[in-house]
């Protein structure tokens, strides 16, 4: 354990698939790197993770300090100053001694054990924070990607609306449609413009949040990889409940408090001090040696209430551990259910998108041939937009579910995503 602590202290400081591919083709200025790279960078540079690392280093320093021996004490006593001389001889005596206190009854070992367990608890809390942060960062990355996808979808929808407006005007000019159709097409263009502006704003906000979470010096303008289309593998074998970072952290904190009980039980044991020194006499050049033993007497304070308080803290920590175990089990079962549901929703949304795309294609052909009214074409286009947005939402929901499952299993979400 000493080597672990010492080494730690030295640690340095769309249309279809096109929607998912277009963000990669945007400007490379301030682009978010692929998620695995961003995750590793953020774990080292994000302010929240820097704070956790500092807490672990502090706990490691405390554990190393707990191994220190008590310091010796030097005493100087000057006696008979100003006393009358006896037969012309000075009565002065100077005593110089050094006292080394010793911790008996295993007090030092108990203190060291507390330091090591507090260090282990700090490491467990850091791992818990890293796992939670990875899940949150994955969701933020996927949210930014989804917002960019919606922005591209809105831009494409605006282009379709303008094409429909041009077609409507041509039909109106040729006398095949009433001027009302042109006004309806203009209204559709205006709605598409508003939707594009809203989607652009949402994408900017999502990228800004991703930048802030990762500790980036400037806001990102795009993402360079896709989590929405990542085929993350769901572990077949259920992870042991003890692997949950929340359970490990709660258990480590319980163990640290349990070690503190031993410290409190031994606190009343006296520290014995052994003294040795020399005494010089004023009336002669001779010196004498002095030795002594000092110890406190635990007459009034035997730390009974301190022991009781430490025991109750352990009981409270055990109750928290039991609660965390139950919550961790529920969280994992819920995450597994969410992943299964998200997969079904994504499959259904993908089928719906394909059907909506085919319906729009046929409606466009029918409108241009004069067989389909404009209002029906507009309705079909809205259905296509809704279907594609639903696919984006389903992909984002799957990322959320996979991130929650990784957190429940104690894994860094999408650490090895491809």
Curated annotation (Swiss-Prot):
Keyword Acetylation among UniProt keywords: no
Keyword terms, alphabetized: Cobalt, Nickel, Plasmid, Signal, Transport
Pfam family, any one: OEP
Keyword Phosphoprotein: no
Signal peptide: 1-29
Induction of the gene: By nickel.
Coiled-coil ranges from the UniProt annotation: none
Gene Ontology terms for molecular function: efflux transmembrane transporter activity
Family per similarity comment: Belongs to the outer membrane factor (OMF) (TC 1.B.17) family.
Known function: The products of the genes cnrA, cnrB, and cnrC are likely to form a membrane-bound protein complex catalyzing an energy-dependent efflux of Ni(2+) and Co(2+). The mechanism of action of the CnrCBA complex may be that of a proton/cation antiporter.
Protein name: Nickel and cobalt resistance protein CnrC
Organism phylogeny: Bacteria, Pseudomonadati, Pseudomonadota, Betaproteobacteria, Burkholderiales
Gene this protein is translated from: cnrC
């Amino acid at each position: 354990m000493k080597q672990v602590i010492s080494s730690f202290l030295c640690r340095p400081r769309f249309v279809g698939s096109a929607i998912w591919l277009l963000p990669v083709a945007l400007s490379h200025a301030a682009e978010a790197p692929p998620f695995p790279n961003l995750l590793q960078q953020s774990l080292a540079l994000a302010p929240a993770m820097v704070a956790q690392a500092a807490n672990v280093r502090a706990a490691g320093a405390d554990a190393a300090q707990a191994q220190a021996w008590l310091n010796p004490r030097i005493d100087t006593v000057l006696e008979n100053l100003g006393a009358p001389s006896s037969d012309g001889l000075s009565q002065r005596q100077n005593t110089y001694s050094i006292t080394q206190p010793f911790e008996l009854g295993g007090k030092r070992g108990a203190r060291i054990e507390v330091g090591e367990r507090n260090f282990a608890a700090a490491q467990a809390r850091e791992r818990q924070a890293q796992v939670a942060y990875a899940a949150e960062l994955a969701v933020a990355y996927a949210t930014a990607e989804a917002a960019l996808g919606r922005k591209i979808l809105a831009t494409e929808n605006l282009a379709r609306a303008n094409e429909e407006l041009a077609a409507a005007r041509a039909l109106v000019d040729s006398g095949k449609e009433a001027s009302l159709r042109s006004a309806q097409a203009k209204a559709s263009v205006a709605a598409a413009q508003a939707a594009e502006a809203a989607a652009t704003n949402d994408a900017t906000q999502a990228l800004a949040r991703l930048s802030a979470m990762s500790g980036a010096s400037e806001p990102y303008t795009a993402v360079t990889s896709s989590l929405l289309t990542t085929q993350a593998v769901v572990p077949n074998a259920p992870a042991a409940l003890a692997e949950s970072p929340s359970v490990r952290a709660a258990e480590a904190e319980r163990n640290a408090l349990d070690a503190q009980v031993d410290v409190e039980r031994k606190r009343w044991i006296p520290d014995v001090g052994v003294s040795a020194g020399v005494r010089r006499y004023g009336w002669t050049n001779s010196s004498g040696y002095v030795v002594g033993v000092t110890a406190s007497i635990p007459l009034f304070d035997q730390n009974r209430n301190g022991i009781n308080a430490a025991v109750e803290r352990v009981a409270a920590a055990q109750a928290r551990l039991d609660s965390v175990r139950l919550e961790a089990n529920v969280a994992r079962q819920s995450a597994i259910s969410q992943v299964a549901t998200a997969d079904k929703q994504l499959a259904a949304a993908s089928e719906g998108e394909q059907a909506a795309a085919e319906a729009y294609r046929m409606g466009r052909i029918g409108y241009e041939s004069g067989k389909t009214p404009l209002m029906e074409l507009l309705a079909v286009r809205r259905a296509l937009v809704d279907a594609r947005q639903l696919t984006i939402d389903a992909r984002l929901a799957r990322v959320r579910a996979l991130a929650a499952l990784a957190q429940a299993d104690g894994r860094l979400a999408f650490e090895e995503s491809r």
